[in-house]
């Protein structure tokens, strides 16, 4: 029973890494810096409810942030998101 749970956890972790790692790679600049506007939205690890804004590749969209974790593609207002991520 314990082995099955362990294997399930390893499989889940592997799938999460396969999904997340390419997204992080595509968010890198040529000099290795991460472009936060290309990161996927991430609600974080907690269950609190904060309305935040993230850039989805074309525009800023509202999402719910849990209050801990996540990534830097998170802004308190649509204006702050557009100022940082909208390309002129």
UniProtKB/Swiss-Prot annotation:
Keywords: Disulfide bond, Protease inhibitor, Secreted, Serine protease inhibitor, Signal. Disulfide bonds join 37-85, 60-81. Residues 37-85 form the BPTI/Kunitz inhibitor domain. GO terms for biological process: envenomation resulting in negative regulation of voltage-gated potassium channel activity in another organism. The record marks 39 as: May bind Kv1. The keyword Transferase does not apply. The keyword Disulfide bond applies. SUPFAM superfamilies: BPTI-like (SSF57362). Residues 28-33 form a propeptide. Belongs to the venom Kunitz-type family. 03 (sub-Kunitz) subfamily. This is Kunitz-type U15-theraphotoxin-Hhn1k.
């Amino acid at each position: 029973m314990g082995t099955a749970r362990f294997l399930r956890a390893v499989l889940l972790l592997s799938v999460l890494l396969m999904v997340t790692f390419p997204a992080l790679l595509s968010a890198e600049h040529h000099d290795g810096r991460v472009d936060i506007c290309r990161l996927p939205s991430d609600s974080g690890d907690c269950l609190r409810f904060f309305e935040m804004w993230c850039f989805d590749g074309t525009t800023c969209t509202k999402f719910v942030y849990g209050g801990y974790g996540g990534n830097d593609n998170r802004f308190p207002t649509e204006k702050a998101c557009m100022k940082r991520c909208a390309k002129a």
